[in-house]
């Protein structure tokens, strides 16, 4: 199983990217059982002022992503390091519970956020280059999906435990990034 630090290794990172590229360019069709474009609004507790604010921001992010444009391709949608496994020098994806047709930008943004690419600016920039997210328009779309990933998994964590520190941290980071964008 990969460790978060394995994405610092260019060879392992590129094997993971290759696995995602192969998935995204495949002819697979997934049922629409999980969509990051709306799941956050279904799990947010709008009687809680903080979660209500997060939901409203999520709605604005989805509006912006929709305005930019969404492509639907086969996506894994849960790309924390433990879902990448190495067997006989090959990288595989496991845990397909949330797979569905979605935008590849969510997959990559989710991978970056869940594996802390943001903690190393050089790694983040190199990895963005490796996946072809180079111009400002692509970076903007990627960043919106990154915020959406934080909102989705942050709310998900709070549903499991209302005191989940990682969930609160993800949501607070999403809010900070959103307000920095001044939407």
Residue positions per predicted region:
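All-alpha amphipathic helical-bundle segments outside canonical DNA-binding/catalytic cores
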Residues: 136-146
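ATP-binding pocket architecture of kinase catalytic cores
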Residues: 1-34, 45, 52
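An alpha-helical support segment within catalytic cores of ATP-dependent transferases
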Residues: 26-77, 81-82, 87
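Non-membrane alpha-helical structural segments and their capping/turn regions in soluble enzymes
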Residues: 10-17, 121, 125, 168
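A glycine-centered beta->alpha junction motif in the catalytic cores
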Residues: 1-9, 25, 41-46, 151-165
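Active-site activation/catalytic loop segments of kinase-like enzymes and analogous catalytic loops
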Residues: 105-134, 147-165
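Catalytic activation segment of kinase domains across protein kinase-like and atypical kinase folds
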Residues: 82-109
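ATP/Mg2+ or Mg2+-diphosphate-binding catalytic cores
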Residues: 52, 56, 133, 155-183
